[in-house]
Amino acid sequence: MPTRHLAAIALALLAASAHAAFPEKPIRVVIGFPAGGPLDQHARLLAEKLQAVLGQPIVVDYKSGAGGTVGAQDVMKAPADGYTLMLANTGVMVINPALYSKLPYGTLKDFTPIARTAMQPLALLVTPKLPVKTLKDFTEYTKARPGQINYGSAGNGGISHLVPEMFKSATGLFMVHIPYRGSAPAFTDLMGGQVQFMAESIPQAASYHKQGKVRALAVTSRERNPALPDIPTAIESGLKGFEVVGFYGFLAPAGTPPDVVATLSDAFKQVMNNPEVRSRMVSQGADPAFLGSADFGKFLAAETPRWEKAVKASGARLD
C-alpha cells in the first residue's frame, strides 16, 4: 500500500480517536449576565451533575452586557469543538433577534442547539389595592377603564414587558406600559399601587403573593405551578390557548461536529433525568423540560416568529 494511503488512514484514525475521546478537557459554559441571577443558579445546578457524567470540569464564565449579546458573541467566535457552550434564556435566543436591528448573531445561523433544559412560567399579578380577585375580574375592570391601568416591567423589550403585551393582544385591553430599571423597583410600585399589573417569574411572585404584598391572578403555563398551587392558569381563567413561558437552553458554536453534539445532548438528558436535579430545579422556579438537539432546534424555529410578533406589537427597539 502506498505510503500516502497509510498516512491518510493514520490521520483518519487519529481524528476518529479524538472525537471518540470527547471531552478531554474542561468545558466552559458562558452566561451573558452577571453572577447570582437565575441563569447562574441553573448553570451551577446542572454543572455539578454534568461534570460527573462527562468526566471533566464544567467552568461557568460570565460575559455580561447588552442583554446577553456580549456572551453570545463570545461563544459564536469560539472554536466549534464542544468545549465552549452558551446557557441562554428566552431573551438571548428569540427576543433579541427582533429587538435589535443590528444584532451581531442569528440564533439558528450562528449556533448549534444542544439541549433545552427548562421552561419558566410567569405569574400575572395585580396590586392588592385593586378590587379584583380573578383574571376575569381584572379583565372586566380594565375594559371599563381604558388607558387608566398601568403595568410595570423590568425594562423595555424584556419578557416582563412582552408577556403583558401578549395578554393585551389576547384580551383587547388598553393598558399603559411603565418600564423600570429592573424588577425590584417595579415590584415596589406594584405593592404601592403606582402600577396595577405585572408579569413576573414564579419564585419572586409566589413569595410576595404569600406575604399578601401582591395578588397572583393566574400563571402562564399550561398546568398549575407547585409554588402557587391554588392559582389557576390563564387558560383555566378563560384565555384559550394563552400559554407563554420563558425557557433555558444550551447552545454551541455553529459547525460543532454532530458526534460531539450528540455526546453533549445525551449528557444533558442523563442529568435531566436525575430526580434530585428535577426537584432542585422546581425549587428554583423552573420546570424541567428537556429537548434534545434536533427537537430544540425545531422549538426555537417555532418560538422565534411568536416572540417577533410580540416585540413588533410592543414597539420596543434597543438599537
Question: How would you describe each model-predicted region?
Answer:
Residues 77-83, 90, 98-185, 234-236, ...:
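Hinge/capping helix and adjacent helix->loop/strand transition within the periplasmic-binding protein
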Residues 24-26, 171, 210, 258-319:
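An extracytoplasmic/periplasmic, membrane-proximal ligand-sensing/linker region
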Residues 8-17:
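Bacterial N-terminal signal peptides
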Residues 20-109, 147-150, 156, 172-201, ...:
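N-terminal (or domain-start) structured segment
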